[in-house]
UniProtKB/Swiss-Prot annotation:
This is Succinate--CoA ligase [ADP-forming] subunit beta, mitochondrial. GO terms for cellular component: mitochondrion; succinate-CoA ligase complex. Gene3D superfamilies: ATP-grasp fold, A domain (3.30.1490.20), ATP-grasp fold, B domain (3.30.470.20), Succinyl-CoA synthetase domains (3.40.50.261). GO terms for molecular function: ATP binding; metal ion binding; succinate-CoA ligase (ADP-forming) activity. It comes from Columba livia. Residues 1-2 form a transit peptide. Residues 11-238 form the ATP-grasp domain. HAMAP family: Succ_CoA_beta, Succ_CoA_betaA_euk. The gene is SUCLA2. Its EC number is 6.2.1.5.
Length: 413
């Protein structure tokens, strides 16, 4: 999992780092938006919906308001527009039909750019480290620019040990087309952004656009920052900023239980240890005509509690008609997984078929636990056979539902 912050929080981090950004304040009610607009004192303001999704500007709110980024010209208008955003769901291409709730808006001064540029820092495997990315074409979808004109994207790899050098930032600013009198200022902003990237264990910082504004100042008009979830233990300040209202409830529960979970569209639940084995398990389910309902990696040191929580996560998805547990016990002990399965099946009064494939450390103890439980858990030593079995069982349950038959795999028998 990666952490994404709201724009106003990202802009706050930039401001702390001494990077030029437009003045703005977050508002959580229309009345707050009115008050902030009045305090800013400008007749030109921008109201930005704070929703963790791309394409806000082209989105639509429930209630009919078009666009999650609006220009307003008075505190009264700021209040009126905010009232149509706050507490409403915004639907974009990225959110799909579920939409995402807007709980706050960012009220900021409007700046007039002479030119717009694109700038980002990300980790890239081909360079085995961080890379600066720039383009003279900012303020637009950079993926479209890359597809239509790949030469417009400039990359500058950074040696992770030596760090960024001023000549690298200057070279990139020149290639991006900054006027000669602003090259040094643009380069200084890039260096500050790189230092921010390292300080907070970011995996990406995207500024779109970075601009030369009408007063001749280089400014970052927007900021998107992603953080490495592995750094949560030392980036408490950052991870405490996470807005869980923007996440699926299952993602929240998975994070709480320290499980790697991603919900999918299928009907076969998967519980696996190890990301590689989890992906291979999903592949083999697809190979035999099934569709995985999730990616779920319990890791190498899962406890009975975590396995139970994993089952709760899987079964909270009402599309799930069968479950495949695939464990290769190296560090992970098979008997711990078996205890978790037995506890979960009993606690949840599970009525859907569970196929279990266990191999490795203490596998015989695990099989004995499952047998002694008296539960109808279907064991299989071969992964290919286990996948075929769970796909077939999901098809049986599907047919029963289509025929309006109350066919359940009663556990225990």
């Amino acid at each position: 999992r990666r952490l994404s912050l709201h724009e106003y929080l990202s802009m706050g981090l930039l401001q702390e780092a001494g990077i030029s950004v437009p003045h703005g304040v977050v508002a959580r009610t229309p009345d707050e938006a009115y008050k902030i607009a009045k305090e800013i004192g400008s007749k030109d303001l921008v109201i930005k919906a704070q929703v963790l999704a791309g394409g806000r500007g082209k989105g639509t709110f429930e209630g009919g308001l078009k666009g999650g980024v609006k220009i307003v010209f008075s505190p009264e208008e700021a209040k009126a527009v905010s009232s149509r955003m706050i507490g409403k769901k915004l639907f974009t291409k990225q959110t799909g039909e579920k939409g995402r709730i807007c709980n706050q808006v960012f009220v900021c001064e409007r700046r007039y750019p002479r030119r717009e540029y694109y700038f980002a820092i990300t980790m890239e495997r081909s360079f085995q480290g961080p890379v600066l990315i720039g383009s003279s074409q900012g303020g637009v979808n950079i993926e479209d620019v890359a597809a239509e004109n790949p030469d417009a994207i400039i990359k500058e790899p950074i040696d992770i040990v030596e760090g960024i050098k001023k000549e690298q930032a200057v070279r990139l600013a020149q290639k991006m087309g900054f006027p000669s009198n602003l090259v040094d200022e643009a380069a200084e902003n890039m260096i500050k952004l790189y230092n921010l990237f390292l300080k907070y264990d970011a995996t990406m910082i995207e500024i779109n656009p970075m601009v030369e504004d009408a007063s001749g100042v280089v400014m970052c008009m927007d900021a998107k920052i992603n953080f490495d979830s592995n750094s949560a233990y030392r980036q408490k300040k950052i991870f405490d900023m996470q807005d869980w209202t923007q996440e699926d409830e299952r993602d929240r529960q998975a994070a709480k239980a320290d499980l790697n979970y991603i919900g999918l569209d299928g009907n076969i639940g998967c519980l696996v240890n190890g990301a590689g084995l989890a992906m291979a398990t999903m592949d083999i389910i697809k190979l035999h005509g099934g569709t995985p309902a999730n990616f779920l990696d319990v890791g190498g040191g899962a406890t009975v509690h975590q396995v139970t929580e994993a089952f709760k996560l899987i079964t909270s998805d009402k599309k799930v008609l069968a479950i495949l547990v695939n464990i290769f016990g190296g560090i992970m002990r098979c008997d711990v997984i078996a205890q978790g399965i037995v506890v979960a099946v009993k606690d949840l009064d599970l009525k859907i078929p569970v196929v279990v494939r266990l191999q490795g450390t203490r596998v015989d103890d695990a099989k004995a636990l499952i047998t002694a439980s008296g539960l109808k858990i279907l064991a299989c030593d071969d992964l290919d056979e286990a996948a075929k079995m769970v796909v077939k069982l999901s098809e049986i349950v599907t047919l029963a539902k289509q025929a309006h038959l109350d066919v359940k795999f009663q556990l225990p028998i």
